[in-house]
Amino acid sequence: MSIPKNPLILVPARMASTRLPGKPLADIHGEPMIVHVWRRAMEADLGPVVVAVSEQEVADAVRGAGGTAVMTRPDHPSGSDRVFGALQTVDPDGKHDAVINVQGDLPTISPDVIKAAVPPFGDSEVDITTLICEITEDSEKTNPNVVKAVVGLSPGNNC
């Protein structure tokens, strides 16, 4: 693959979180969490940003802030499935050459971190990139709710 010229950012969000029910609408300094995430994704300035939701109140919050939201089925088992469902609606003809999945519970994500997912596509052998960081909190190492990646790093290379 080559570096995307027309990427699409999709942000999955759902109210039925088991760890923090209602988290997309959690108030952070007077605004819903999902609005903060949408703004960070917009600030990355990579392409259109669409929030994939299954509840009207989340869509209303995003649209009220000037964003775009698309309704998805409420029974998607994961955020990745919600992104795929939204992609079928938003880009059925595949006009976007990459999809960047920014999770809806990252209100402090830096736009530069979102941008960091793009350059690896310049390598013709790369079809997917995933941003990771080293787990530094011992409690997170065994927490099943913390996503983990196993990687092989060359000497001197770190996250």
Predicted regions mapped to residue ranges:
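Short beta-strand segments
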Residues: 12, 101-103, 131-134
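Short, high-confidence coil segments that cap the C-terminus of an alpha-helix
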Residues: 46, 94-96, 123-127
